[in-house]
């Protein structure tokens, strides 16, 4: 038994050594075939002597049980995101802020690293043994991915070396090599499976796969970018760089592209160097990360609830690619606006395959002087939105055909009219244009309008195409037998939709105005109009002068409202919706008087978390009916933050700003007081 135990231990040490060289030092000192042979030997020996298998054995990275679900796990300290900048001025402003928060005579150096485009995770080691791993999640709570993280070869299950803390937290990125990503997608295409759009998505999907064995097959890579010692056993480590090097000595992978910079010139030179190397790397990066190197200064500078003040991501300018323009299609929006969209040969930019980009309006087509088959330059603004930058006219063929903005609607063939003030071209045929009809109907029954559960774009499109509906009125006469003939609509779903249509008849003037889809009239403007006119008939009979008196409603929107109710077909439809379809508008005058008496009247409120008693939309509706103003962002002007379970960073931001915080029980009590 002793000789077998020694042999097992020897094989483990050899394999762990090879893994360290390969994954941490990027050195291959053994062939794949030799490694597989040694691995098989160890596997077979451990299979016969299961009592000798430790948790850090190389064999424990395969054959794990299949997870049923991922449980939530709280981080020991928040996993914050980074502030971003795309230019030198942004970096200089960041440095200026740091100088203000410390004494100017203190030496200041920065640790500069690659900003890997991967999935952020946290790993905990106790006594040098891997015990758990979690995704970032919302920064305060992530998913327990321990079983899957064990399958990543570059994550050591047992640390080596000396001075290992009793408890250690490692933070870093999990990513997939571009070469492995291409192989994975080829495999998926052969099996006719849905493939991944970019390496980051592939890494995220693989890391959260229900079967850890699949995670193991995907060849994910981990790279450390930070750590924390819960028991301060390494007092000699005073800088971020020293910590990273210590992690490397323990066998934790750290990317080799790290420099210490003491001047602006050094940082900019490093940024330019990495920008030039970017396209030649086998993994995606989207910039560099600049961190104050001194741990003492990091602590002194501190963090906001969202990001550390001592670090910033200096992102690359949008990447550009040259491709060929194939076509420009003219789309018709809900309000009749014609939007040109360019279609071109697909190009891969910043990890995403792009084949189309909005051209916004007629002016943009004229600016670019577009012709069919033009050679064009494409980029992603902010590494997100596809944009056609310019045309390389020198490559244009002599007989190239110029792209002309249409004079008639591409869907209904109605003559288009140009609004010079708005810089827009519209089809004014309204609901007689199928493209506008479909989108207008979806808007009419959307969540912020007269919400009907289950009535999505696919069902509405099919109802229009089958001639079952032509305008909103027709929906109130639908029967379940009409819906059953549609794709994927059974008896139960049809009844659910019909019942929801009946319920949506009772609404507010604000929701009704918004549902009409008048150009420029969003949710906020609809509320202002409702509060000003109080009654629908007053709005319908208003003139331009009255409309211009409404605060926040400009000349263009006033004209749009006046033109809408001046159109006979629109007026007839509104009257039929009220008198025939039976839409009932809550009395706005009584609502306004009552809302002024409530605790929430005219208060700016922000919501965060999940609420027990009602959905987010229901709660917003209740608060708005009480005269509240709902906002998405916390500021010093916020009156209340109302929070539920699993609240996010807004809660801590509110505390920092001394904003009054209301929990679910207090909220229920306040709502009952009103009632």
Swiss-Prot record:
Residues 595-675 form the BRCT domain. Keywords: DNA damage, DNA repair, DNA replication, Ligase, Magnesium, Manganese, Metal-binding, NAD, Zinc. Its EC number is 6.5.1.2. It holds the Pfam family DNA_ligase_OB. It catalyses: NAD(+) + (deoxyribonucleotide)n-3'-hydroxyl + 5'-phospho-(deoxyribonucleotide)m = (deoxyribonucleotide)n+m + AMP + beta-nicotinamide D-nucleotide. Its cofactor is Mg(2+); Mn(2+). The active site is at 115 (n6-amp-lysine intermediate). One of its GO terms (cellular component) is cytosol. One of its GO terms (molecular function) is DNA binding. It comes from the Bacteria. NAD(+) binds at residues 32-36, 81-82, 113, 136, 173, 291, 315. GO terms for biological process: DNA repair; DNA replication. Signal peptide: none annotated. It is an enzyme of class 6 (ligase). Zn(2+) binds at residues 409, 412, 427, 433. InterPro entries: BRCT_dom, BRCT_dom_sf, DisA/LigA_HHH, DNA_ligase, DNA_ligase_AS, DNA_ligase_CS, DNAligase_adenylation, DNAligase_N. DNA ligase that catalyzes the formation of phosphodiester linkages between 5'-phosphoryl and 3'-hydroxyl groups in double-stranded DNA using NAD as a coenzyme and as the energy source for the reaction. It is essential for DNA replication and repair of damaged DNA. NCBIfam families: dnlj, PRK07956.1. PANTHER family: CHROMOSOME TRANSMISSION FIDELITY FACTOR 18 (PTHR23389), DNA LIGASE (PTHR23389:SF9). Belongs to the NAD-dependent DNA ligase family. LigA subfamily. This is DNA ligase. It comes from Buchnera aphidicola subsp. Acyrthosiphon pisum (strain 5A).
């Amino acid at each position: 038994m002793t000789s077998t135990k020694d042999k097992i231990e020897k094989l483990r040490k050899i394999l762990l050594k090879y893994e360290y060289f390969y994954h941490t030092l990027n050195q291959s000192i053994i062939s794949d075939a030799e490694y597989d042979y040694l691995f098989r030997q160890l596997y077979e020996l451990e299979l016969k002597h299961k009592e000798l298998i430790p948790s850090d054995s190389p064999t424990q990275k395969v054959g794990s049980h299949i997870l049923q679900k991922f449980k939530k796990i709280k981080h020991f300290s928040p996993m914050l995101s980074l502030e971003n900048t795309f230019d030198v001025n942004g970096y200089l402003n960041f440095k200026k802020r740091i100088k203000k928060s410390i004494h100017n005579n203190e030496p200041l150096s920065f640790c500069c690293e690659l900003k890997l485009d991967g999935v952020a995770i946290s790993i905990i080691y106790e006594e040098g043994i891997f015990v758990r791993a979690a995704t970032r999640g919302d920064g305060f709570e992530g998913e327990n991915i321990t079983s899957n993280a064990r399958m990543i070869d570059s994550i050591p299950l047992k640390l080596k070396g000396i001075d290992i803390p009793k408890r250690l937290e490692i933070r870093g990125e999990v990513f997939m090599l571009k070469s492995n990503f291409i192989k994975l997608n080829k495999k998926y295409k052969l099996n006719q499976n849905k493939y991944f759009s970019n390496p980051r998505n592939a890494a995220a999907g693989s890391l959260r796969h229900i079967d850890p064995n699949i995670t193991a097959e995907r060849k994910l890579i981990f790279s450390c970018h930070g750590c924390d010692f819960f028991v301060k056993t390494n007092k000699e480590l005073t800088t971020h760089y020293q910590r990273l090097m210590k992690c490397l000595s323990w066998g934790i992978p750290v990317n080799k592209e790290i420099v210490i910079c003491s001047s602006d010139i050094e940082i900019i030179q490093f940024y330019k160097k990495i920008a030039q190397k970017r396209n030649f790397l086998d993994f995606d990066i989207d910039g560099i990360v600049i961190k104050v190197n001194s741990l003492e200064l990091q602590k002194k500078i501190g963090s906001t609830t969202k990001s550390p003040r001592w670090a910033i991501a200096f992102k690359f300018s949008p990447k550009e690619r040259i491709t060929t323009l194939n076509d420009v299609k003219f789309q018709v929006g809900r309000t009749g606006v014609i939007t040109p969209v360019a279609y071109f040969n697909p190009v891969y930019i910043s990890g995403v395959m792009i084949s189309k980009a909005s051209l916004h309006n007629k002016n943009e087509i004229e600016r670019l002087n577009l012709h069919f088959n033009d050679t064009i330059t494409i980029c992603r603004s902010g590494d997100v939105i596809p944009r056609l930058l310019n045309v390389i006219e020198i490559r244009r063929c002599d007989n190239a055909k110029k792209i002309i903005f249409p004079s008639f609607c591409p869907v209904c063939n109605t003559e288009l009219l140009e609004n010079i003030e708005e810089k827009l071209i519209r089809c004014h045929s309204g609901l007689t244009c199928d493209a506008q009809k479909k989108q207008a109907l979806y808007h009419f029954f959307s969540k912020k309008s007269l919400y009907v559960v289950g009535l999505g774009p696919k069902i509405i499109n099919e109802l229009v195409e089958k001639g079952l509906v032509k305008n909103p009125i027709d929906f109130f006469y639908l029967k379940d037998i009409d819906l059953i003939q549609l794709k994927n609509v059974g008896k139960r779903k049809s009844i659910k939709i019909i019942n929801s249509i009946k319920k949506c008849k009772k609404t507010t003037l604000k929701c009704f105005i918004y549902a009409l889809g008048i150009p420029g009239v969003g949710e906020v403007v609809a509320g202002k109009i409702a509060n000003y006119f109080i009654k629908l008939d007053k709005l319908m009979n208003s003139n331009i002068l009255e409309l211009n008196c409404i605060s926040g409603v400009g000349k263009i929107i006033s004209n749009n409202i006046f033109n809408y109710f001046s159109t006979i077909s629109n007026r007839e439809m509104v009257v039929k919706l009220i008198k025939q379809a039976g839409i009932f508008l809550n009395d706005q005058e009584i609502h306004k008087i009552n809302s002024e008496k409530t605790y929430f009247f005219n208060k700016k409120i922000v919501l965060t978390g999940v609420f027990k008693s009602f959905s987010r939309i229901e709660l917003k509706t209740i608060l708005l009916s009480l005269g509240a103003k709902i906002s998405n962002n916390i500021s010093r002007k916020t009156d209340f933050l109302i929070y539920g379970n699993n609240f996010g960073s807004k809660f801590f931001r509110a505390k920092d700003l001394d904003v009054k915080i209301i929990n679910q029980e207090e909220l229920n009590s306040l709502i009952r007081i009103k009632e």
